[in-house]
């Protein structure tokens, strides 16, 4: 019976398995995360500030000229109701503009959860923390494209 009492002291397995989300910030008060989308990879730093967003050394409105891409980039901040509270610096490489905007959005969402773990449930519910795994399907031999066949002539 002494063995059973020592087992009760350990607690249930669910208590031990639940990870506590801890704030991850470097010595300069920034949180860092990487985001990916298609062929693009973004490195994102988030710190408390006035709401500046810089992508590859330019203001995000200059780098992503299309309003749709700017909206994609700002979605996590708007969903978390933290507009104008963070300075965001991102470097992104590879892919096209749409993939790069998605990569920065993914990295920004992860960095926000590291900076402020309480935002995790809101961002998870919005689907911002999930890596979008859709990539271009490869071309197959005997086909014109990935699925399109060559033109067929009956006669």
From Swiss-Prot:
GO terms for molecular function: RNA binding; structural constituent of ribosome. PROSITE patterns: RIBOSOMAL_S9. The keyword Ribosomal protein applies. GO terms for biological process: translation. SUPFAM superfamilies: Ribosomal protein S5 domain 2-like. The keyword Ribonucleoprotein applies. It comes from the Bacteria. GO terms for cellular component: cytosolic small ribosomal subunit. InterPro entries: Ribosomal_Su5_D2-typ_SF, Ribosomal_uS9, Ribosomal_uS9_bac/plastid, Ribosomal_uS9_CS, Ribsml_uS5_D2-typ_fold_subgr. It holds the Pfam family Ribosomal_S9. Signal peptide: none annotated. Keywords: Ribonucleoprotein, Ribosomal protein. Belongs to the universal ribosomal protein uS9 family. HAMAP family: Ribosomal_uS9_B (MF_00532_B). This is Small ribosomal subunit protein uS9. It comes from Rhizobium etli (strain ATCC 51251 / DSM 11541 / JCM 21823 / NBRC 15573 / CFN 42).
């Amino acid at each position: 019976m002494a063995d059973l009492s020592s087992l009760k002291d350990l607690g249930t397995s669910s208590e031990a398995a639940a990870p506590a989300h801890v704030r991850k910030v470097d010595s300069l008060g920034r949180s860092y995360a990487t985001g990916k989308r298609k062929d693009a990879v973004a490195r994102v730093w988030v710190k408390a500030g006035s709401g500046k967003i810089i992508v590859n050394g330019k203001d995000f409105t200059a780098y992503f000229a299309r309003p749709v891409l700017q909206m994609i980039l700002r979605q996590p901040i708007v969903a978390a109701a933290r507009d104008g509270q963070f300075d965001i610096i991102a470097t992104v490489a590879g892919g096209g503009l749409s993939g790069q905007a998605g990569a920065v959005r993914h990295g920004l969402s992860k960095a926000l959860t590291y900076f402020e773990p309480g935002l995790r449930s809101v961002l998870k519910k919005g689907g911002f923390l999930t890596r979008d795994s859709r990539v271009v399907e490869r071309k197959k031999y005997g086909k014109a494209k990935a699925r399109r066949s060559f033109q067929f002539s009956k006669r």
